Curated annotation (Swiss-Prot):
Its cofactor is Fe(2+); L-ascorbate. It comes from Saccharophagus degradans (strain 2-40 / ATCC 43961 / DSM 17024). It is an enzyme of class 1 (oxidoreductase). InterPro entries: Oxoglu/Fe-dep_dioxygenase_dom, PKHD_C, PKHD_hydroxylase, Pro_4_hyd_alph, Pro_4_hyd_alph_FE2OG_OXY. Binds 1 Fe(2+) ion per subunit. Fe cation binds at H96, D98, H159. This is PKHD-type hydroxylase Sde_2812. One of its GO terms (biological process) is intracellular iron ion homeostasis. One of its GO terms (molecular function) is iron ion binding.
Length: 226
C-alpha cells in the first residue's frame, strides 16, 4: 500500500522545523546508509544524535500518534526515530532498497523495517526535481507532496530520489515495524477500518456496523504480533 497522508504537521510546525534545519550542522548522508545504498546515496543528513534532530523527531512522533489515518494504515509497533535530510545542488539518491533491520542508536532495540515514510518539509515550488520515485505493483509512482504531508509505502519497494537541480528539499524519513508485517493484510485492515468509519459517520451504530467492527478486531487479533 502506498498512502499519502495530508497535514501530518501544521504549517506552524513546518515553519519551526525549517527554521531550525536551516541553521543545522549537516553531515554526509552516508552516515546511516547500508552497504548497497551507500553506492547510490548523495545527500546531506543530520547526525542521529543531533539535538535538533531529536527535538524535531519528537514533534513528528507526537503528531503521528494523533493521526488516525496513520495509526490505521501503519498499525505501528516500533518506530525508528525520525531522521532528516537535505537535497540541493544536484544531489540525489539512486535506486535502492532499505535495510531490513535497523538498530536504534545507543540502544539494543532493533526495528524490522516494514514501512518506509517520507515527511516533506519543503513546498513543491521551493525546489526543482527531488521527486521520490517508488516502484510498486502498478509501476513507478512519483511523489512530491506539500510541506507537512507524508507518504508511507512498503519498505520492500525499490525507490529513489531524483536530482534536485534548484532550491533545497528538506524532509524527514524513517521506518517502522508494524504489528501486522504483511502489506496485503495491512491493506485489507485499513480498507475495512476506513469503510467502517465512513458508515459510522453516516448512520448511528447499527448491529451490522458492530458486527463488522468485530470482524475487523478479530482479524487484527489473528494477524497482529505484539
Amino acid at each position: 500500500m502506498l498512502l499519502k497522508i495530508p497535514n501530518v504537521l501544521s504549517k506552524e510546525q513546518v515553519e519551526t522545523a525549517k527554521s531550525k534545519l536551516l541553521d543545522a550542522d549537516w553531515a554526509d548522508g552516508n552516515i546511516t546508509a547500508g552497504y548497497q545504498s551507500a553506492k547510490a546515496k548523495n545527500n546531506l543528513q543530520l547526525p542521529e544524535n543531533s539535538p535538533i534532530a531529536i527535538e524535531l523527531g519528537d514533534i513528528v512522533l507526537t503528531a503521528l500518534a494523533q493521526n488516525n489515518m496513520f495509526m490505521s494504515a501503519a498499525l505501528p509497533l516500533k518506530i525508528f526515530p525520525p531522521l532528516f535530510n537535505c537535497y540541493q545542488g544536484g544531489r540525489s539518491f539512486g535506486v535502492h532498497v532499505d535495510n531490513a533491520i535497523r538498530q536504534v542508536p545507543g540502544t539494543p532495540v532493533k526495528v524490522r523495517t516494514d514501512i518506509s515514510m517520507t515527511l516533506f518539509l519543503s513546498e513543491p515550488d521551493e525546489y526543482e526535481g527531488g521527486e521520490l520515485v517508488i516502484e510498486d505493483t502498478y509501476g513507478s509512482q512519483s511523489v512530491k507532496l506539500a510541506a507537512g504531508d507524508m507518504v508511507l509505502y512498503p519498505a520492500t519497494s525499490l525507490h529513489s530520489v531524483t536530482p534536485v537541480t534548484k532550491g533545497r528539499r528538506l524532509a524527514s524519513f524513517f521506518w517502522l515495524q508494524s504489528m501486522v508485517n504483511s502489506d496485503e493484510k495491512r491493506t485489507l485492515l485499513f480498507d475495512m477500518d476506513m469503510a467502517i468509519q465512513s458508515l459510522r459517520a453516516q448512520v448511528d451504530d447499527s448491529p451490522e456496523i458492530v458486527q463488522l467492527t468485530g470482524v475487523y478486531h478479530n482479524l487484527l487479533r489473528q494477524w497482529a504480533q505484539t
